[in-house]
């Protein structure tokens, strides 16, 4: 089997860098990275700087285009489709033209993934999403993940999933993400796993269990997907646990407890000294930081006129050196509650993270995004 990869929503190349570091012969044949509404495609340009461009089967360059406009048949063939896609509204309806066709909401990237799977028939897939995917939407818990499973089931994939806190497995960031591994039932791996006991697959023998070791399952629960994706969208609700497996429309899920590894601590990634612009030197800004990081209760009124109390607990200020970093958001370094504020090891003064520290927190090499 040829070890080829297609990388969607590639960002600055995290998936590709991870496979390259494994040094096991995987080769990326095509990628896609496009940021809607941006005048400059910084992430795409960073990716190309490190890895170069990829042409499609027509010899054309479309890696920086909106994936919804890309000819899926022209994407080079690949063994593994990977990508981190956002948690969006996955609800669907029957198309007007056909009661068997389905139509998702415009702009929802899952449907682009599905179209590529139909066009290219990749034997294996690895996807990443936020941890709340398993519980969304609030009005119909589990529906969105059920739709994804239903789509994959219709295309003859079985699926393993796990919610992973990166810091528990040795990374520098307490970042919880849902990882999804799907494989065609006709593959050698699929035929082998289809004979496995579901609990053993989730906790011992499956890819997720071997990559992210856990202790024994707590309690296995099962349910079945509705007959089609539209019915799943309309009526399916289920409380997914942090680990599970789906085969032929039957879902098996259980809470699992991770076997922890030694994490990288925030203090280990900090530089000694930084440019003056990173330091908090203004008294008014310092007061704002203290307010944002502190506990608070605020009376608010909803659009409908309902009054309620908004409350939130405190965040450590500054962030402690002896723990992994918190989840880093795209708003990192701006004046907001989620931004890391650290005591500089060299100066003893409070400041935000430098670009190099942010790269280290995400597992990239220093100056990767320069």
Where are these regions (language model features)?
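Core alpha/beta nucleotide-donor-binding catalytic domains of modification enzymes
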Residues: 1-124, 130-146, 150-153
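Conserved hydrophobic/aromatic beta-strand scaffold that supports enzyme active sites
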Residues: 82, 161-163, 179-181, 327
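Short catalytic/ligand-binding loop motif for oxyanion handling, primarily in non-cytosolic enzymes
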Residues: 16-17, 88-92, 133-136, 170-173, ...
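Flexible, glycine-/basic-rich loop-and-beta segments that form/coincide
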Residues: 171-250
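Conserved S-adenosyl-L-methionine
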Residues: 64, 131, 156-168
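Residues that flank catalytic or metal-binding motifs in active/ligand-binding sites
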Residues: 148, 160, 174-178, 324, ...
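C-terminal target-recognition/interaction regions appended to catalytic cores
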Residues: 247-370
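A short helix->loop->beta-strand "cap" motif at the edges of active sites that frequently abuts
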Residues: 120-123, 157, 176, 336
């Amino acid at each position: 089997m040829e070890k080829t990869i297609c990388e969607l929503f590639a960002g600055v190349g995290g998936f590709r860098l991870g496979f390259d570091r494994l040094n096991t012969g995987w080769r990326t044949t095509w990628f896609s990275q496009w940021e809607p509404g941006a005048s400059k495609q910084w992430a795409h340009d960073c990716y190309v700087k490190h890895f170069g461009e990829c042409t499609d089967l027509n010899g054309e360059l479309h890696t920086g285009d909106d994936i919804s406009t890309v000819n899926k048949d022209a994407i080079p063939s690949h063994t593994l489709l990977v990508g981190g896609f956002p948690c969006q509204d996955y609800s669907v309806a029957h198309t007007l033209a056909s009661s068997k066709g389905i139509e998702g909401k415009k702009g929802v990237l899952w449907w682009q993934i599905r179209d590529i799977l139909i066009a290219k028939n990749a034997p294996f897939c690895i996807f990443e999403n936020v941890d709340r995917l398993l519980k969304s939407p609030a009005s119909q818990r589990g529906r969105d993940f059920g739709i994804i499973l239903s789509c994959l089931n219709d295309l003859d994939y079985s699926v393993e999933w796990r919610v992973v806190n990166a810091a528990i497995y040795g990374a520098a960031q307490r970042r919880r993400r849902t990882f999804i591994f799907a494989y065609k039932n006709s593959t050698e791996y699929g035929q082998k796993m289809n004979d496995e006991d579901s609990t053993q697959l989730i906790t011992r023998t499956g890819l997720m269990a071997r990559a992210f070791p856990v202790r024994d399952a707590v309690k296995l629960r099962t349910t079945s997907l509705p007959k089609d994706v539209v019915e799943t969208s309309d009526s399916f609700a289920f409380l997914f646990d942090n680990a599970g497996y789906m085969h032929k429309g039957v879902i098996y899920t259980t809470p699992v407890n991770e076997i922890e590894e030694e994490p990288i601590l925030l203090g280990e990634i900090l530089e000694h000294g930084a440019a003056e612009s990173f330091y908090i030197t203004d008294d008014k800004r310092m007061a704002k930081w203290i307010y944002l990081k502190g506990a608070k209760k605020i009376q608010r009124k909803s659009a409908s006129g309902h009054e309620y109390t908004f409350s939130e607990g405190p965040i450590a200020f500054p962030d402690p050196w002896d723990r992994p970093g918190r989840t880093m958001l795209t708003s990192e370094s701006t004046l907001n509650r989620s931004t890391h504020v650290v005591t500089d090891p060299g100066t003893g003064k409070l400041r935000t993270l430098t670009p190099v520290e942010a790269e280290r927190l995400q597992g990239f090499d220093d100056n990767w995004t320069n």
